[in-house]
Amino acid sequence: MNKFARHFLPLSLRVRFLLATAGVVLVLSLAYGIVALVGYSVSFDKTTFRLLRGESNLFYTLAKWENNKISVELPENLDMQSPTMTLIYDETGKLLWTQRNIPWLIKSIQPEWLKTNGFHEIETNVDATSTLLSEDHSAQEKLKEVREDDDDAEMTHSVAVNIYPATARMPQLTIVVVDTIPIELKRSYMVWSWFVYVLAANLLLVIPLLWIAAWWSLRPIEALAREVRELEDHHREMLNPETTRELTSLVRNLNQLLKSERERYNKYRTTLTDLTHSLKTPLAVLQSTLRSLRNEKMSVSKAEPVMLEQISRISQQIGYYLHRASMRGSGVLLSRELHPVAPLLDNLISALNKVYQRKGVNISMDISPEISFVGEQNDFVEVMGNVLDNACKYCLEFVEISARQTDDHLHIFVEDDGPGIPHSKRSLVFDRGQRADTLRPGQGVGLAVAREITEQYAGQIIASDSLLGGARMEVVFGRQHPTQKEE
């Protein structure tokens, strides 16, 4: 049973709709058909009884009672409403008169039928019916066709019993009128028989119509399924919001979910890219130190602190970026601690001197010890590390660092004697993946990360020309008042 349910119950919506609707139509059709058949049967019986009762009244009117005998004289031009066979009984059930002497018919009249007015039926065979229809050639032809199709077919004759009370001219009589044409040969009965075929044809016609209705009704769901497949194949980014009213809420929620997932994916991808870029400097220092150890230019005792410092920085950077990934987009600063700027820059300069040792970069700094940075230390190190690394990469020999501080802003200036940045590219270098010099190795990430961090401090980075002949980067950190609260 469970196996059957697993294989057959999870049907498609179209099949479910079709089966459910077909079931409803079938039940309603059968119900209406049964009601129609019962109604027709009752109406048919009433109509037949009324006609036979009319024949009975006619014979009662034409009957004469003389010398304790009854006689019936039928006019020659009398037009009977229907071919019938009439029998007249007295109150004791004795047969007084019969229109024709047909023994099997007389025996078929049950004594209990004669006790009350009523409507009955006599079941017989084709041969017996043929004796009743001896004078009706049209009915005989129809009966012949029935005999050819089924020699054992049963015929049903309607019987009406009417009791007439005694009067001055007539004793109590019971008149039995038998319809000589069986129900099976009547046109009305054939209509009844055809009703079943009409019902079956109706169902066969309804099923394809229901299929078309199901196909048309479920087209929006098919379209939605197709769009989902296109999403899986990366052929579309969002679901079409122009859909039916019932699916609008679902599509809107799915689009919101897709947007959230895409933003989260982009956030972590960006964070991973930024982390990879930030680890380049400490890894380069480790590589330079190991090279010095291999060439015996540095002793183990001197190399160990340098390597431990860079390993510690790598660990800090990983923790910092994981935390930053969870806070990205919130607009809330990680901390508002006070950090002297000069020591932080000294550590960066020391690391960069090791990275660019072969190039022989000369980095000079002119910063007052009182100048401080308010915020997360790793934010400052990340921004200035990227800006200084760019300056060292593109300078010829000299890099100069200076700073000034106002009530709410910290300005740090980094200048080099390199080729500088063309005016047309000064805004592009802060976009991810964009670089002013595409001939040198790089990813175009450092300055983009620096700008994103400074914007969190309501600051900016401004590129201009330096008096040294190269580029001048002005890094501005806002929100530098120690007592300032986040809005």
Curated annotation (Swiss-Prot):
GO terms for MF: ATP binding; metal ion binding; phosphoprotein phosphatase activity; phosphorelay sensor kinase activity
Alphabetized UniProt keyword annotations: ATP-binding, Cell inner membrane, Cell membrane, Growth regulation, Hydrolase, Kinase, Magnesium, Membrane, Metal-binding, Nucleotide-binding, Phosphoprotein, Protein phosphatase, Transferase, Transmembrane, Transmembrane helix, Two-component regulatory system, Virulence
Binding site for Mg(2+): 386, 443
Cytoplasmic topological segments: 1-16, 215-487
UniProt GO BP: phosphorelay signal transduction system
Principal location class: membrane
GO cellular component, one term: plasma membrane
Protein task: Member of the two-component regulatory system PhoP/PhoQ which regulates the expression of genes involved in virulence, adaptation to acidic and low Mg(2+) environments and resistance to host defense antimicrobial peptides. Essential for intramacrophage survival of S.typhimurium. In low periplasmic Mg(2+), PhoQ functions as a membrane-associated protein kinase that undergoes autophosphorylation and subsequently transfers the phosphate to PhoP, resulting in the expression of PhoP-activated genes (PAG) and repression of PhoP-repressed genes (PRG).
Regulation: Autokinase and kinase activities depend on low (uM range) Mg(2+) concentrations. Phosphatase activity is stimulated by high (mM range) Mg(2+) concentrations and ADP at 1 mM. Autokinase inhibited by radicicol.
Impact upon substituting residue 48 to S: Confers to cells a PhoP wild-type phenotype. No effect on net phosphorylation of PhoP. Decreases 5-fold initial rate of autophosphorylation and shows a wild-type phosphatase activity
Effect of residue 184 to K: Impaired PhoP repression by high concentrations of divalent cations
TM annotation in the entry: 17-37, 194-214
Name of the protein this chain belongs to: Virulence sensor histidine kinase PhoQ
SMART domains: HATPase_c (SM00387)
